[in-house]
């Protein structure tokens, strides 16, 4: 009997640890009401209309004029400017080698997006274009302490005077933690996916949302293919809002609408 009690105590302790690690924010941020049923154009409405590369001003305008929320990605440049761009490197979208964070804004403005005449926009240019017409989901692209705090600080300096609605999210828990500490008024989210086969214990911890104790996110944005992840479901059960990414077809977009009240899509235009 004592052995059984010991086992139960150990299991209870493990459960308590998991709950502590996975628990989202205790609060219910008022902006979660906006996220309920919200659909978001991934990097703007790109790949649908001519001459609208991802994360470009035309792609943002195409979404905004249709009343569709927009997901954007932001990096910090070598000279401390905040630009809207997804990849860490420039080869896929600009056809040149190089790391975006090693370039100055001036150097980046000489490049073109996806073989078009459009340039890499700054965060300021994006905000001026959207001007509060639709909500923005801003992903902070950082993977290290070297860029995390500078990016968060620089972006916040720009965003603090923005009158429109925005949410922040990141795969990097310290970036979400920065907003937890310094901008409690902003609805913050932890991005994740099923990285169980990736090398590194930190990737497995991210997949299981075991780093939530750092950021206590208001919502969890998870790759929809891994909807059944028990840790994701536990986090939602504990009170996190559920957001899913990235849907590329109408069938799955509709299929997972209940599991993910907020859905990010690309390569098609959802039916109204």
Name the predicted role of every residue range.
Residues 1-272:
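Phosphate-group recognition and catalysis centered on beta-loop-alpha active-site segments
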